[in-house]
Structure formats: structure tokens, C-alpha cells
Curated annotation (Swiss-Prot):
GO terms for cellular component: cytoplasm; cytosol. Keywords: Amino-acid biosynthesis, Cytoplasm, One-carbon metabolism, Pyridoxal phosphate, Transferase. The gene is glyA. The modification N6-(pyridoxal phosphate)lysine is found at K226. (6S)-5,6,7,8-tetrahydrofolate binds at L117, G121, H122, L123, E241. Its EC number is 2.1.2.1. This is Serine hydroxymethyltransferase. The lineage of its organism: Bacteria, Bacillati, Bacillota, Bacilli, Bacillales.
Length: 415
């Protein structure tokens, strides 16, 4: 950085400290990733100066000829990646992408079927503290108490009983493959629209390593970060028949001007997804998650559903006598970043929880391999089993430091 250190030392120091934190800690938050330098350059470009209300060729401002090119590139690449008929890359977040779909097809008070938050769903899938649970009548489905897999019989029974206008699939903490075909069949049986929120698994879908929801769903929403490894933002994919309504729901419905610098970064990251090495990356994300799951299981640590099919693992801490709140703090103290997370049928409060969520997208971007993830699993077990033993915790810190030194992050950044 050339100008910021001299102009605003306080902000620069905060950025520099965050850069140091990312380098010296192991990032296992499942919703986080490390974007490329090219993505960061696009997001920090002069496009941040341009207002561009509307869509390419139909703007409310002049001087949009170059940002039109950028947005068209982003849309075309997303269509190619996922095989979608229509794409909107303007949502500022996944939550706003979901809101736009709801505003497109629902009226206040309409019934919607969505996944219970504590079973792995998302706030925008009907949580009573979120706009979705306030505006609409959400009925919850969940996972089987024994297998901890989605109970499709329960989904069907609730769909038949409540006749929802929309069924929502997708999750923020579900480690297993979702059967989109089964959901489509249930939606058709009750005459419901079908939406998939693939925010967590979009990169795996893009690589062909998880079933693609686009052929089955009326609407697919996603974030553009997480496993897709782009900038923080959202996107909607849908059938052409819904395209104009979706676009109107985003603008002028719930947003004003799009963030063109972020859309440029989305376009760059989509270009990266189309490269052959992205599939290798996504394969490594999954294999690393499986190695981490195996390492934790070997240490006697329980996992929700017994393992993972994707990038994330949900750890059940009850056998260790720990809460998620305590475990998150213990791991942070040794240099591993995670988040407390509810588990299915969790007896603890949402700010305490009985679990932690772990993900491998970020560490895989950093270069961690299967052996490294096996070591990470051993370190986690050492710390959690000995969370009051300062000697053991110091050993864990040293082992974390050895890994972060071995896999440096952003070697070319000058701060």
C-alpha cells in the first residue's frame, strides 16, 4: 500500500493487523475463504467511483459503457459455470438475493417451507428474528434425530399438510449432499415454487462435485464468496421466465446502485472458476474436509451425521463436556479460528451452543494438504481435551505456528 499509511495510519494499522491475523492463524470458519490478488485488485479499482443504477444497456446514468462490459462478463461467466438461463449479479449479499426471490413470488403471510436454523438452515430461511420469519409464515423441516440427515419424508408430510407457496432448500451448517431432485418432486406434488440457497456449496457445484440445483429449482441464490472464492456478495440464477421480475425485485425493488467494483471482482473470480485448476481446488476442499473429519473421529470426537460430503464439519462437543462458546474461545487462543454453532436438537442457547462448525475452503486456498488437515485435527483434539492445561495449549500453539509458517499467505502483499 502506497497512500493509506501516510493518510490514515489508524485504518492502515487495523488492516495490517488483520493481514497478520490471517497469516498467523488457521482459518476454519466454513463461510470464509481467501480471494486471489487479482480479485482484490478488481475490487479496489476505479470502478468504485461509478454509479450505475439499472442494467447493462438500460442505465439511469450516463458514462456506463465500460461498467456495462464488466457486468455482462460477470453474467455470461455465471451462466456458463452453472448452466443458468438468467443471472443477476447485483445482490450485495446472499440475504438480499433471498429477499429478492421472496419479494418476487410471495405476499406477506404466505406459507413457506424451510430448514430449521438449528438443524443447519439459515436466518433467511424463516428464523423469527429475521425479516423472513416476520413477513412470511415459515414451517420448518429438519434432520432425522438418529441419522442427522435431512428427513425427506418429514419434508413431504409437512408440504402436504401446509401446502406452501415456496419450498426452500439449502443450508449454512449441513455437511451432507442435498437431494434437489427429491425436493423438486415434493414441490411439484403440492404445486409450490422451489428455491435453493447454495451459498455454501456453490464452488463445489461449479466444479461438478455436488449436484447442480439449477436444472431442478425455479430460483437458485448464492453468495459469491465461501467455496466460490470470490468477493463478498450475492447472485441469483433463475429460469428466463422469472428473469424480468427478479431484476425488478433487485432494482428498483430492494437496492439502488450496484457495487460495480464488487461486480468486477465477481467477474474475475468467475473467470478463475472456469479454469481447470479450480476443479482440483474443489476436490482438495472436500478431501481435506474428509481428512479432518477422520482425524477428529480418530480422537473420539463426535461429528454431526458422522462425517461430511462437502467442505464443512459440525462437531458435537457434548461428550467433551464443552459448549461451542468455550470451544471457540479455546481454539482462538491457540490460533485456530472457528465459530460456535448449534447442532440438531441442541439443548443450549444460540449464543452458547453445543457445537462448533469447521470448514476447509480457506485453508485449502492457502495450500494445506491432507496431511496438514490431519495435523489440524490432532491439534484441535489436544486443545479441547486439555483446555485447562497451559502446557498442552502452548504445545498446540507451537504446532499451529509450524503450519502457518509452512503455508504462507499472500506472499506478494507489501504490508
Amino acid at each position: 500500500m502506497k497512500h493509506l499509511p501516510a493518510q490514515d495510519e489508524q485504518v492502515f494499522n487495523a488492516i495490517k493487523n488483520e493481514r497478520e491475523r490471517q497469516q498467523t492463524k488457521i482459518e476454519l470458519i466454513a463461510s470464509e475463504n481467501f480471494v486471489s490478488e487479482a480479485v482484490m485488485e478488481a475490487q479496489g479499482s476505479v470502478l468504485t467511483n461509478k454509479y450505475a443504477e439499472g442494467y447493462p444497456g438500460k442505465r439511469y446514468y450516463g458514462g456506463c459503457e465500460h461498467v456495462d462490459v464488466v457486468e455482462d462478463i460477470a453474467r455470461d461467466r455465471a451462466k456458463e459455470i452453472f448452466g443458468a438461463e438468467h443471472v443477476n449479479v447485483q445482490p450485495h449479499s446472499g440475504a438480499q438475493a433471498n429477499m429478492a426471490v421472496y419479494f418476487t413470488i410471495l405476499e406477506q403471510g404466505d406459507t413457506v417451507l424451510g430448514m430449521n436454523l438449528s438443524h443447519g438452515g439459515h436466518l433467511t430461511h424463516g428464523s423469527p428474528v429475521n425479516f423472513s420469519g416476520v413477513q412470511y409464515n415459515f414451517v420448518e423441516y429438519g434432520v432425522d434425530k438418529e441419522t442427522q440427515y435431512i428427513d425427506y419424508d418429514d419434508v413431504r408430510e409437512k408440504a402436504l399438510a401446509h401446502k406452501p407457496k415456496l419450498i426452500v432448500a439449502g443450508a449454512s451448517a449441513y455437511p451432507r449432499t442435498i437431494d434437489f431432485k427429491k425436493f423438486r418432486e415434493i414441490a411439484d406434488e403440492v404445486g409450490a415454487y422451489f428455491m435453493v440457497d447454495m451459498a455454501h456449496i456453490a464452488g463445489l457445484v461449479a466444479a461438478g462435485l455436488h449436484p447442480n440445483p439449477v436444472p431442478y429449482a425455479d430460483f437458485v441464490t448464492t453468495t459469491t464468496h465461501k467455496t466460490l472464492r470470490g468477493p463478498r456478495g450475492g447472485m441469483i440464477l433463475c429460469r428466463e421466465e422469472f428473469g424480468k421480475k427478479i431484476d425488478k425485485s433487485i432494482f428498483p425493488g430492494i437496492q439502488g446502485g450496484p457495487l460495480m467494483h464488487v461486480i468486477a471482482a465477481k467477474a474475475v473470480s468467475f473467470g478463475e472458476v472456469l479454469q481447470d485448476d479450480f476443479k482440483t481446488y474443489a476436490q482438495n476442499v472436500i478431501s481435506n474436509a474428509k481428512r479432518l473429519a477422520e482425524a477428529l473421529t480418530k480422537e473420539g470426537i463426535q461429528l454431526v451425521s458422522g462425517g461430511t460430503d462437502n467442505h464443512l464439519i459440525l462437531v458435537d462437543l457434548r461428550s467433551l463436556g464443552l459448549t461451542g462458546k468455550v470451544a471457540e474461545h479455546v481454539l482462538d487462543e491457540i490460533g485456530i479460528t472457528s465459530n460456535k454453532n448449534a447442532i440438531p436438537y441442541d439443548p443450549e442457547k444460540p449464543f452458547v451452543t453445543s457445537g462448533i462448525r469447521l470448514g476447509t475452503a480457506a485453508v485449502t486456498s492457502r495450500g494445506f494438504d491432507g496431511d496438514a488437515l490431519e495435523e489440524v485435527g490432532a491439534i484441535i483434539a489436544l486443545a479441547l481435551k486439555n483446555h485447562e492445561d497451559e502446557g498442552k495449549l502452548e504445545e498446540a500453539r507451537q504446532r499451529v505456528a509450524a503450519l502457518t509458517d509452512k503455508f504462507p499467505l499472500y506472499k506478494e502483499l507489501d504490508y
